[in-house]
Design a protein with these regions (language model features):
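N-terminal accessory targeting/assembly segments
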Residues: 1-111, 417, 421, 426-427
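C-terminal-of-GTPase-core extension/linker across diverse P-loop GTPases
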Residues: 1-13, 33, 134, 138-212, ...
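Conserved nucleotide-binding/hydrolysis micro-motifs of P-loop NTPases
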Residues: 17-21, 51-53, 85-88, 109-113, ...
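Short alpha-helix plus adjacent loop in nuclease-associated cores
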Residues: 109-128
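Switch I (effector-binding) loop of TRAFAC-class P-loop GTPase G-domains
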Residues: 189, 196-202, 220-250, 260-270, ...
Length: 427
């Protein structure tokens, strides 16, 4: 689709508060407004209803639905976004109540629409399309003529801004093809990860809330050339680059897709293969926008999602970014260790950050003597790159090397230890 599709999109944002507080709903709606802005729409008004449970037919109560219809017509609204997940029948019923010129989408459909706009790699585009076919397409069934008449738009775009396929006859076949292609890509990613493991280089993943400055930091440290915009989910595909630490060691640094509150589990699952970069990292940098008043809750969201991914036990370094803009909530660090303050935009504090990364990667190091056969010289290269070699003695069929190594490197080379501990947990 051309860009004119989203021009003139006037939207209303709707939230139903069934638990939590009105303040929580307002914070979430403010975030939804930023999502809509990223997708190219304009928020005209917001509506919040307190209700014990959502209405089965229209999510809103009948009186509130009628009120919404009045304000939609009065303000010439053509898109209504609900800050929740709507069923296909609820979307149909709401659109019938609001008029045939109004489209209704939910939070997941909006996020997927942004993903579709920003996916750059082949794998990213396939992941987005598969997620849309499983979630968005069933909510658009039978609307082909209507979408064509309305010009598609936010919530209906596929990767590359093509209109999303909604033909029921093609869906299951396309889903199977995408699942097979993505499984092959995931296997290739695992193969590449194994090859990186053999290099002995430590892996550090930058994770955190969307728009916290993850891509800006990777660009500053590695000249990665990643698009870094002041928009939500500007980066969707993970990018890995080599980064040199102060002591000369080279690590692999990865920028990952950002997190957001109320990120549906089906979206987490859809991007599991790329999020595995965080699961398999030796150290996580949790990036935080220090200037954001919601920094504390954003850390909690990030920590909860990492726990869901199985990365909750990873070593963590909290990186409070954008400190040149001021620190909104110093209390966000309460009870947390390993905290650094930087500005990825100006470079302030970045050298100290690199030094701390180096320290954390090598905590618990000890001196070990390895006996390396002459035909395994690649092992010697791993030691020189990732450890401190103190002594080397060449023999007829092997080399004995004494080096100071950390647990990660030792785990790779334990088989060559001349005096290994009886149990690996004795390290």
């Amino acid at each position: 689709m051309e860009n004119q599709i989203t021009e003139g999109v006037r939207a209303a944002l709707v939230s139903v508060v069934t638990r939590g507080t009105a303040e929580d709903a307002e914070i979430s709606l403010a975030e939804l407004e930023r999502l809509l802005d990223t997708a190219g729409g304009v928020t005209v008004f917001k509506m919040i209803q307190n209700k014990e449970a959502p209405d089965v037919r229209t999510y809103l109560g009948s009186g509130k639905t009628a009120e919404l219809a009045f304000y939609v017509a009065r303000n010439e609204i053509n898109l209504v976004v609900f800050d929740c997940e709507l069923s296909p029948s609820q979307i149909r019923n709401l659109e019938q109540a609001l008029g045939d010129t109004v489209r209704v989408i939910d939070r997941s459909m909006l996020i997927l629409d942004i993903f579709a706009l920003h996916a750059a790699s082949g794998e990213g585009k396939l992941q987005v399309e598969l997620a849309q076919l499983k979630y968005t397409a069933p909510r658009l069934m039978g609307k082909g003529t209507e979408l064509s008449r309305l010009g598609g738009g936010i919530g209906t775009r596929g990767p590359g801004e093509s209109q999303l396929e909604t033909d029921r006859r093609h869906l299951q076949r396309r889903i199977r093809m995408l699942e097979q292609s993505l499984a092959e890509m995931a296997e290739n990613r695992r193969t590449q990860r194994v090859a990186r493991d053999r290099s002995g280089q430590a892996r550090v993943a930058i994770v955190g809330y969307t728009n916290a400055g993850k891509s800006t930091l990777l660009n500053y440290l590695t000249d990665a050339g990643i698009l870094a915009e002041n928009k939500l989910f500007a980066t969707l595909d993970p990018t890995t680059r080599k980064c040199r630490l102060p002591g000369g060691e080279t690590i692999l640094l990865t920028d990952t897709v950002g997190f957001i509150r109320n990120l549906p589990h089906h979206l987490i699952h859809a991007f599991r293969s790329t999020l595995d970069e965080a699961v398999n990292a030796d150290l996580l940098l949790i990036m935080v926008d220090a200037s954001d008043a919601q920094a504390a809750s954003q850390i909690e969201v990030t920590e909860a999602l990492l726990q869901d991914l199985g990365a909750g036990d990873k070593p963590v370094l909290y990186v409070f970014n954008k400190c040149d803009l001021g620190v909104a909530i110093p209390g966000a660090v309460h009870g947390r260790e390993n905290v650094m303050y930087i500005s990825a935009a100006t470079g302030q504090g970045v050298e100290r950050l690199l030094a701390r990364i180096e320290e954390m990667l090598h905590e618990g190091s000890r001196r070990v003597t390895f006996r390396i056969p002459n035909d395994k010289q690649g092992v010697l290269s791993i030691l020189y790159r990732n450890a401190t070699v103190e002594d080397i003695r060449y023999g007829t069929d092997a080399v004995e090397v004494t080096a100071v190594v950390d647990a990660r490197v030792y785990g790779q080379l334990r088989v060559y230890d001349t005096d290994p501990p009886k149990e690996t947990d004795q390290w």
